[in-house]
Amino acid sequence: TYGAKAAVHGKYVLTDKLWAYLQAYAEKHRAAGNGFGFGLVTPEQTARTLSARYYKDGSEILVSRGKNKNPRRLTPRECARLMGFPEDFQIPVSDTQAYRQFGNSVAVPVIREVARIMRPHVLALAEQERTGALQAPLFS
């Protein structure tokens, strides 16, 4: 699932029935003026938000396979990449559980950067508490 010619297992391709349903459902909502729709992207485009419900039908992020071909869902590995997990991260659970877990995750690079910025402040507060310079306890 990496690169332009990467092979993806057929189980990730939407069935004719599901693809027809999603198109009809989107059209019904478009006609009613609602915002429902599926997210169809090419590998070069930015993906939409990955949610924990992705395992149901994958409609938030569908990958185009070209004209007259049903789109496919992301693979769990692609979801891991979107969320910033390293390539060597092992996915020890079923696809369904992996989709839920990655959809509930916060992007790893975001957490890393927040922690990097917070670290000196947390250490300074801890030092103030240790030396008695802190006016009020951090936690009570």
Across the structure, where does each feature detected by a protein language model lie?
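S-adenosyl-L-methionine-dependent DNA methyltransferase catalytic core
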Residues: 1-140
